[in-house]
Amino acid sequence: MGDDCIAVKSGKISVGAKYKVPSSNIRIRQCCMRDGHGSITLGSEMAAGIKNLQARQCVFLNTDRGLRIKTRRGRGKDAVIDGILFEDIRMDSVLTPFVINSFYFCDPDGHSEYVQCKEPLAVDERTPQIKELCFRNIQAKNCHVAAAFFYGLPEQKIERVEMKHIQISYAEDAASGQPAMMDGIDQNICKMGIFARNIKTLVLEDIQVAGQEGEVISMDGIDSLEWRK
């Protein structure tokens, strides 16, 4: 497997603080991504932010993760992800189709207590933020690890995640694995449903998950849930 197929970045904190130019107004359409760690990845070096990105009419084949957002403490207060839309996407044999990881363990200090602590820390100049994300009209078949894995910072929760008209099913011979590159989670997960932690507003509408082991959704730290079946 190679690296991420498409990676959108805007630099580490020294670059973001100096130039303050986010990656913005990006359109990705009619692309086929295959055999990568992530199909479309935002971050983790995004200290100037990523805003107003739309990905539509794409196909993902045999990647570890499909729509992947990765950040961590230390990226800075200008490291804001906002206005993100993923729509009309088909996936086949993607291990975990949707990932938001606020504890990405990159860089020499990636495994440090500061980066990996799951308890709320003080919000300061180093704290990144994830605002509004929308996943709409997406089908993923032959998944392995998890339907979706969303883990925000406890001190700076993800503001809003919308999932609408989503269909997910698992491979019969699904193999276990780790849904996100972070410490403190099970590395042998298989056929998990939707895992959601530390989100202010989570909107689920017309979500179909077939063949998961356990509950369809596991939640903690969700301030508001709108579930329209």
Protein language model features and the residues they cover:
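Extracellular/periplasmic carbohydrate-active domains that bind, remodel
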Residues: M1-K229
